[in-house]
Amino acid sequence: MSLTCLASNTKEDLNVFIITGNFLKINSGYVAFNKKEIDFLEKIIKIYNPNNRITLLDMSCLEDELMNSTNKNTKFTPYTLLRLYIDDEVFSSIDNRLLYMDIDTMCFGDIKELYNFDLKGKTLGMVRDNVGRHWIHKNYCNAGMILFDVDKTIANKDKIIKAREMIRTVKMFMPDQTAINRAFKDDIEFLPSKYNEQNKMEKDTLVRHYCGVLKFFPYMHIIKVKPWDDDIEKFHKQRKEHVMDKSIEITNEFVRQYKNNEEPYLIK
């Protein structure tokens, strides 16, 4: 769903990296994407632009390291940590920028605007976290969307290593996000909220992030429902949005096509 939103709104060629891994020692449900699935996803995004492509980054080799992490038993899966293990070979193969996006981020415009944002000499571009900026620190950022300056990321590899070490040894709330905030303190350019809108759709929202949202009325609770959940009415009721309805319909049709071993095609 995130990929179709991205591909349908972006005119430029997309070079997509999907990070995955088998972590069955941690949880029997932590199964990597396979080649058949990736090939099907690539066919989907090529519907929008034949030059779009996908590369699979399988990080199953990290299982033992993640098993020994102090943060392995948090509510966050090991997949949230993998953005910190993208290696130099990948960064070196990319010109200028790498845009990381969580699977629950949806684009509502051409991503070129965000990709070309001026980072003013900083290594990372991030949006402040909707909850953490009030409860943790005013400049605490959300890691669901990270814009990397590739050259500076390679030059500042020590900060990546520092973040990995913190995840391995220091118990943290939201470990991946907190480690990034600490390791890259003073090296993050704060981006406008429209590039990672965590609360609700606004008129200028470019990237909507359907992460957990803390609500206080009628009682304190967290909204966790995602666009791909089976109960669409629950999504409408809790998120109070219908902007994803067409994308949900398109995605459900692609899922049906995949299950029936059909070639993907776009419904009207």
List each language-model region with its residue ranges.
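Histidine-anchored nucleotide/phosphate-binding helix
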Residues: 1-11
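A glycosyltransferase accessory/donor-loop signature
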Residues: 10-12, 148-268
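Residues at the starts of beta-strands that form the adenosine-phosphate
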Residues: 13-16, 53, 97
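Short internal beta-strands
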Residues: 15-22, 126
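Active-site-proximal specificity loops/subdomain of glycosyltransferases
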Residues: 24-25, 30-89
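GT-A fold catalytic core of metal-dependent nucleotide-sugar glycosyltransferases
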Residues: 56-62, 79-130, 138-140, 145-148
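A short acidic, often aromatic-flanked loop/helix-cap motif at beta-alpha or helix-coil junctions
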Residues: 59-68, 132-133, 196-200
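Short Gly/Pro-enriched turn/cap motifs at secondary-structure boundaries
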Residues: 75-76, 135-138, 169-172
